Amino acid sequence: PFVFACYFCYFFRCPRRNAIIPPGEDTIVSPADGTVVDVSHGVEEEMYLGEKCHKITIFLSVFDVHCNRSPMEGTIKYQSYTQGRFLPAYEKEVGFENERGAIGIEGKHRNILVILIAGILARRVVSWKQLGDPLQKGELYGMIKFGSCTELYIPGEAEICVKKGDTVRGGLTIVGRLKLE
């Protein structure tokens, strides 16, 4: 019981990172700690953005921090929750079949979409923010309980700064740069 309690506390940790969040309106930071398992280009995103995007998929192992952070400053303009299955998070179909929660963030220059996806162990997607709430870059807004994956959709003209296999840290690692006009 003691070991289980220690792991439970370890798993639900949310380290403070406010002092070292990368500055700049053009930078998009990782929404989660984990490993980049896919970077796709020209993905048609119809849920919120309605355009071709880059999709960055981040797998969260049971050893990663499972709190999710806002990739950029903005306001939550879209929010949805979908019940679903609990397939392993590394399967390609999880984004369509598993339980998931999505938020669309309207930024000063462009919009992005973040989807939290539950997995075989992760049975709950939790959001602490509501539609209309403002978010600062790196601010905590949700959690996937017991690991899974996070998908980040960013505009197609943005520069991608990560590749498959990279380790990222939520609120710290720059995953993309917007082209500001």
Give residue spans per PLM region.
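Contiguous, well-folded functional domains in the mature portion of proteins
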Residues: 1-181
